[in-house]
């Protein structure tokens, strides 16, 4: 019985590992909407304060960054920590943090990282799942960078380290 249990667990582990590797190797389709249409996509978020927010509400900043995230994602937490730590270098960037989790979960995340005290950050729920559909998100955090004309610059499918982001927006 012990051998059967061990065999079962080994097969289960290998199957899970195989699936994860297969998912990782799925390339972004060249006809993905964000690669063929350079404009910021249409979306509607329910902000954590209960207000509605769409792409039309994005104020004029040198850059706009859309981050699709999950509050319990360790990489998303790291991204938030680093963003807040470097916010003085990112004052010319408007951040839209969008997730599909519940408002209380998103609000707790936002409060933990002090988003409410930052004038260039909003956080809300993508109730219609439009952002991950548009970008074909496979991992969180997914980061999309747009310039001051709201034109696509670059996407980071697994988040971006702040030095790399600063290099991009410093040269673009």
List each model region and its residues.
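Short, internal strand/loop/helix patches
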Residues: 113-144
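Thiol-/selenol-based redox modules, centered on thioredoxin-like
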Residues: 89, 139, 145-172
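Structural microenvironment flanking redox-active thiols in thiol-disulfide oxidoreductases
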Residues: 77-114, 128-133
